[in-house]
Amino acid sequence: MARMDFNNIVGDPFALIAWLLSFATCVISDIQGAFPNFAWWAVGYMLCAIIGISLVLASQTSHVYGVAIVGYLAAGLTFTTLAVNSLIYDDQASKQAGAAGFILQSMVTIVWIFYFGSSSQTSSRPYLDSMGAGKEHPSYRNSKPLSTNYGARPETVVSGNQPPQMYTSAQLNGFETSSPVSGYPPTAANGAENGTQNRFVGPAIGSQSNLGGGSTLGADHPSTPNEVSQPTVYPYRAKAIYSYEANPDDANEISFSKHEILDVSDVSGRWWQAKKASGETGIAPSNYLILI
């Protein structure tokens, strides 16, 4: 269960102010004379929408209910727009003031639809957060299930066993062997060549006993299938849109704070190899970073 933080609601009062303006002016207009009933439906619907969104923001679960919120807000935008059309052309000042309140609600709704409907990696998301559009605290996103079950990750010596590497014939061009039977010690003519080939392919199953004590395969060509060399070039720069705490059970992950700048070597996967300004390197989830 997420921790309730009502500071998120206090920091974004525009929708509530617009609704109070619409409600007060609609009450005055209804007392003074005839008033369209549809405007009351818009007032009630937007009140329910504001309460629901306030609870979502307070519980910091907008990433869970974002799709549903966008659907409800789309209907609310239709209702407020129709309410404006039914009030703004009247000569009564209170109805025109009510139309102004619905216009403000429509503007806030448009911003909300963009905020909840866009990805957290968009460049405008931090700006909207600073202006109080959502103010979702990043700590709720920084959960352990994300770091352990997020997706495919680069395998290293520490993080696990890497499956055998498979190569195509084009990649092995130049490493062919002239020996008709695999698994026998290389001859003097093709020893170096087969030694290089065995580095990629290895002896046939059951033929290790045929190598004898004179085989120098391990000494001449040490095989480290689990080792992945660290990149030396980091051509990309990324900015952290949320803080992230590395999983203590995985030494390959790195922690970083919100708005911290990282150097990134590869942006093709879900986990990026990153380097901090302090020189610390490791992997970071791509949905916490945005390229700059």
Curated annotation (Swiss-Prot):
Record InterPro entries: SH3-like_dom_sf, SH3_domain, Sho1_SH3
Instruction: Cite the ranges annotated as topological domain Cytoplasmic.
Output: 1-8, 59-63, 118-292
Protein localization: Cell membrane
Where does the SH3 domain lie? 233-292
Q: Tell me any Pfam family this protein matches.
A: SH3_1
* Chain residue ranges for the region called Disordered: 127-149, 203-231
What are the record keywords, sorted?
A: Cell membrane, Membrane, SH3 domain, Stress response, Transmembrane, Transmembrane helix
Q: What does this protein do?
A: Plasma membrane osmosensor that activates the high osmolarity glycerol (HOG) MAPK signaling pathway in response to high osmolarity.
Q: List the protein's name.
A: High osmolarity signaling protein SHO1
Which species expresses this protein natively? Ajellomyces capsulatus (strain NAm1 / WU24) (Darling's disease fungus)
